[in-house]
Amino acid sequence: MAKLAVLLLLAVAASATVPAQGRDPPTQIKLIRGADASGVVGDSMECVYTVFIRTGSIWKAGTDANITLQLAAADGNGVGISDLPAWGGLMGQGHAYFERGNLDIFSGRGPCMAKPPCWMRLASDGTGAHHGWYCNYVEVTVTGPHKGCAQQLFTVEQWLATDAAPYQLEAVRDLCSGGGEGVAAA
């Protein structure tokens, strides 16, 4: 219950950054996978997404690369965030995201998904002096007006790197069905 209270406090703080002119700030979150009226509730930015990402504590686990996140429900509809720190980084001015041992927190508004996320694609663009990155997990919480609070933990425990196994710059986790027949990878 205390964790939910903290998440709601973070969500209120993130939504308080909307300019007084009534315009939404520029955002890096968008609909993915051909989201339609049945898969996404409205096209306004009414839901609040809070994302916790734990970087591994092993040697050279941190990265300077750009990290993107896609989330989808079992029906394949969802959202994609192209630059997590720019979209909703909450760690403060000058914080180095995705560094060894960090628990980085991001929160921002986005279109509401009709169903909770159960599929995730985490990707690195491989740029920067230290492109390799070891991610322990991604935890996502989604809530919105007249909606419950959906929470999903995606265990990653994988390098996103071209020089370490599995030699991929992305990790896909599909928890949509027990038989592994959930959302197809992008």
Regions of interest found by a model, annotated:
Residues A2-A186:
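Regulatory, non-catalytic segments
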